[in-house]
Regions:
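Active-site neighborhoods of divalent-metal-dependent phosphate/nucleic-acid chemistry enzymes
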Residues: 70-116
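Anionic group-transfer/hydrolysis microenvironments
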Residues: 9, 44, 116
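Membrane-interacting alpha-helical segments
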Residues: 52-66, 116-123
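Short, well-structured N-terminal submotif of metal-dependent ribonuclease cores
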Residues: 1-38, 50-62
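Glycine/charged-rich beta-loop-alpha catalytic/anionic-binding loops adjacent to active sites
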Residues: 24-29, 65-67, 82-85
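Acidic, PIN/NYN-like endoribonuclease modules and their adjacent C-terminal/linker elements
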Residues: 1-3, 36, 100-138
């Protein structure tokens, strides 16, 4: 089974039936999923924002959120010092750099809908292929 690191943007699309849901389902199929522990908080915050924007959908949103546990995502500890260094290098938030750090540490594909995070991941992969970059966090 292939390891993949999944970020909150991808999980929110998956749980809340967003337009990109099918794309995410295809990318995650058959994978062993991993994420930093902050994933749960980010997804819960997205659920809260959706409830505030659409109070009439509260119950449906809570039911969708409750299916997060069924996804069997391994929540991993992050080396915060290395994630901070990576955030500074890539100009990402520490939150986003945590996903990027984990993908590097596990040598796993990063599944995200966040354009800035995806660009940083691509740039790091390209640099590591050329032997001049950050190939692994470990």
């Amino acid at each position: 089974m292939t390891d993949k690191v999944v970020d909150a943007s991808a999980i929110v699309a998956l749980l809340f039936n967003e337009l990109t849901q099918k794309k995410i389902v295809a990318r995650l199929r058959g994978a062993s999923l991993h994420a930093p522990g902050l994933l749960e908080f980010e997804v819960a915050n997205a659920c809260l924002k959706k409830m505030l924007a659409s109070p009439g959908e509260r119950q449906m949103l809570l039911e969708a959120f409750s299916s997060l546990n069924a996804l069997s995502i391994a929540l991993e500890r992050i080396n915060l010092a290395e994630a901070i260094a990576l955030a500074r290098r890539t100009k990402l938030t520490l939150y986003d750099a945590s996903y990027l750090w984990l993908a590097r540490a596990l040598d796993a594909e990063l599944v995200t809908l966040d354009d800035k995070l995806a660009r940083a991941d691509k740039a790091l992969r390209r640099a590591s292929e050329q032997g001049s970059g950050y190939s692994s966090a470990r």
